[in-house]
Amino acid sequence: MITIKKQEIVKLEDVLHLYQAVGWTNYTHQPEMLEHALSHSLVIYLALDGDAVVGLIRLVGDGFSSVFVQGLIVLPIYQRQGIGSALMKEALKDYKDAYQVQLVTEETEKNVGFYRSMGFEILSTYNCIGMTWANREK
């Protein structure tokens, strides 16, 4: 049985395998950065199968005006079992009073469909555009 557990502190060694399993190499090639990112998160929810971490959702922000979903990961063999939805629902329930919850994801039919099913809309729906700045030297 899968359980969802809210954490304020998560150790790198407990979740690195998740990032590796989905190929998020920007994190796996910079474990120190990931460790700092984990420790500076607003909150992290873990999906546990017994003691094994099989998924997570990591939020950053102030928790009031802006909450950003920095990552939602479920091990590939556990995907399509409702774990990602359960993680997102738990996060949205806890931050239901936040002015806005945002995220950035790859533009695939699967991703857009999933996040729309969770109540998210593409920014152009609100006549907005998203922008990002990335340090390309790292």
Predicted regions and their residues:
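Short amphipathic alpha-helix that is part of the acyltransferase structural core
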Residues: 1-28, 126-127
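Conserved beta-strand in the GNAT
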Residues: 46, 52-61, 65-73
